[in-house]
Amino acid sequence: MRADTPRLVGRAMTLAYERRTVAEDLTVPVPDGSFTVIIGPNACGKSTLLRALARLLRPAAGAVLLDGADIHRRGTREVARVLGMLPQSSVAPDGITVADLVARGRHPHQGLLRQWSRDDERIVAGAMADTGVADLADRPVDQLSGGQRQRVWIAMALAQQTPLLLLDEPTTYLDIAHQVEVLDLCARLHEEQGRTLVAVLHDLNQAARYATHLVAMRDGAVVAAGEPRRVVTAALVEEVFGLPCRVIDDPETGTPLVVPAARRRVGPAPA
């Protein structure tokens, strides 16, 4: 693998479900050390691309390369030591506690010659501390709020200790406060621990605020990729989403902020 080649690359991929083709000749390199966010309208292929990168969907043509090798020619446990995946809808076994669920992140590192150790205990405790769920360790996961559960799943992915972490719509079904909480956590993992994150998000303004690298998709193709300020323009938003808008600076972060054009003007309230 060349020194300038990212660890994770989707190359010339055709992605399909049975006879329905979602994308053709799709090439997506994931910059090392980035917080990459995939954006686009519904049914454009965002989650399909993420599933392919996560080894959950085999390309009909082309390949996903992990460290220069076809990801489907590598063993499941070997891949799981490098790449973690948080699906869109994760369901915990009934009654399992937070600590026991987070500990499952260590399974790829177990084997006949390597059983549970103090290092595993330390890593699990650290993952729970990093995600702010240590005080919930003995609570059943099914008794937690949506935001708490999502942090627990992220803690399990952290315990897996992979340099690459993929998240499919991690803020789905969460209220705005919990969405910000989860995305702040993802940003901290990227900034403080140097992990490469890839996420699918629906909220364009959240994507522009948190991502260091954006991939904009439409109809199974990449329309633009790069830094948020270069990708999130009024012209591109209208091209990709069909939404006339203005793009201004977010007053809090200076990142691009999409302001939809008014469909109709609302007059002043009657006296």
State the predicted function of each range.
Residues 39-41:
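The feature captures the beta-strand-to-loop junction immediately N-terminal to the Walker
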Residues 62-70, 79:
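Conserved ABC transporter NBD signature motif
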Residues 54:
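Helix-to-loop junction immediately C-terminal to a conserved catalytic motif
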Residues 8, 22-25:
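Conserved structural motif at the start of ABC-family nucleotide-binding domains
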Residues 115, 140-144:
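Conserved ABC ATPase signature
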Residues 240-271:
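ABC ATPase nucleotide-binding domains
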Residues 165-169:
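Catalytic Walker B motif of ABC-type/P-loop ATPase nucleotide-binding domains
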